[in-house]
Amino acid sequence: MSSTRKEIVGAFFWSRFMPEVILSFNDVHKDYLSHSSEWWSKRPLIKAVQGFDLDVEEGDSWGVVGESGCGKSTLAKMVMGLEKPTQGKILFQSHELLNHLSENRTSFYRSVQMVYQHPTASLNPRQTVGQIFQYQIQRMGIDDDEHHSRVCEVLENVHLSEEILDRYPHEFSGGQAQRVCIARALLSKPKLLVLDEPVSALDVSVQAEILKLLDKMRKELGLTYLFISHDLAVVEQICSKTVVMYAGKIVESGPTKKIFKNHKHPYTKLLLESVPVIGKPMESGNKVSVEPIPEDGCPFYPRCSHATESCLELPFSSNDKMDPAHQWRCHHPV
């Protein structure tokens, strides 16, 4: 067999059996102008997201973790078209997301839905669940003859009965309200769900129920998740792959098991050590600094106990030779 024919056959099998990339971030940046107390002074630039690169394959569950202000929710807003990237491109099913939105907004939102952090706040308090679902169905352009069957189907998916259709949001517990929000998101049969801290406002016991439900639906319905969270235990439970962000930049990414058991970046180590454990004494000694974050080097430099002058230069990127999907950006991996 000639080399050209081998390449063609190889490409065929690769495309046939490898999952399709459903969402792709290509060098995405997002900047904001901060508010200034003096009208005459120059407004400083806040770099919320810097050089974000990620390919999300169909059926995957990617977790995006980091402390508050690292750019997680900004990413979610850009995926939903609520914010535009300052630089770079976001592709959905190989088409530029912003073009997709401008050409057919309804089609895009049928494929991409979002579940928010506070379930009750994201539901109209003046409407019953039935009315909320009806509005979503009309908005998504779902055929009239499918209305009842779609509602029954999504309620069954989230383990709720049809009786809740006549109830108002304030009549539900936090867990029930979040199930309603998930059901609403499923009405249009989306391919991608963006979940922004979907269980952080719930009790721990209720969190477990919702996470189990989300994992079950992903496997049964073939959904893809972009899961935004600051809770590492939640991400470990539901996400197959994880991105760790700090100050708008990716510092480590890869399979979730690798991130938790064989992490390389000092910030990932700090995040994992910050999780409280009953009976374990609190450790001190982590470096706290008010130094500005370097523009070119590692953003964690001012707080890192392993930092050297080389960290102020362009960040060093490396990966696990046994598992190239596990990548980190650090000159001195732990």
Feature names for model-found ranges:
Residues H35, W39, E162, G254-V334:
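Charged, flexible cofactor/metal-binding loops and thiol motifs
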Residues M80:
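Helix-to-loop junction immediately C-terminal to a conserved catalytic motif
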Residues G88-N99:
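Conserved ABC transporter NBD signature motif
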Residues D145-E163, L272:
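Conserved ABC ATPase "signature" region
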Residues V194, L202, V206-P281:
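P-loop NTP-binding/switch modules centered on Walker-like glycine-rich loops
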